[in-house]
Regions:
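Short, flexible helix/strand-to-coil boundary loops that buttress conserved ligand/catalytic motifs
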Residues: 21, 55, 84
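Short solvent-exposed loop/turn micro-motifs enriched in small/polar/acidic residues
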Residues: 1, 35-37, 101-103
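Short loop/turn microsegments at loop-to-beta-strand junctions
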Residues: 4, 39-40, 105-107
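Conserved short beta-strand elements that form part of the metal-binding/catalytic scaffold
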Residues: 31-65, 118-121
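N-terminal beta-strand motif that seeds the catalytic metal site of vicinal oxygen chelate
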Residues: 1-18, 27-32, 67-70, 93, ...
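Terminal peptide-recognition signature
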Residues: 6, 20, 44, 87, ...
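Vicinal oxygen chelate
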Residues: 10-14, 68-113
Length: 123
């Protein structure tokens, strides 16, 4: 296998790519746009892991059947905090605000404004 990646289909892909780049300090490594400026396919590098974003052209329920879980090392709590602060802007639902839980001293779970369910935490 050459690689695996996380792929999401959402409305507002161009805005989402910018938000996710800010949240994770992630460079755009591939981007193919549709005529309307949305992304047919975009890839950003989130600490060596690829997050792919494409425009959703059919209605769906993104965020309610799967979750992106990003597990950071103990010395990367600042990355968790930064991502949380960017991604909760306009969030649809915050399940667990940033704080301690049974498996992490620094965790948050929420659905962002694009309908993506995230769990981000550190050791």
């Amino acid at each position: 296998m050459k690689r695996t990646l996380m792929q999401v289909y959402i409305k507002g892909s161009a805005e989402a790519v910018g938000v996710y780049q800010r949240a994770f300090n992630a460079p755009l490594v591939a981007g193919y746009k549709n005529d309307d400026g949305t992304y047919m396919h975009a890839e950003i590098d989130v600490d060596g892991q690829i997050l792919a974003v494409s425009e959703e052209f059919q209605s769906g329920n993104a965020g309610n059947k799967m979750q992106f879980c990003l597990h950071y090392k103990n010395d990367e709590k600042d990355k968790v905090t930064k991502a949380y602060n960017v991604l909760i802007e306009g969030a649809q639902k915050i399940y667990d605000p940033l704080g301690p839980c049974s498996y992490s001293p620094h965790m948050a779970a929420f659905v962002d404004k694009f309908g993506i369910f995230w769990c981000i935490f550190s050791d």
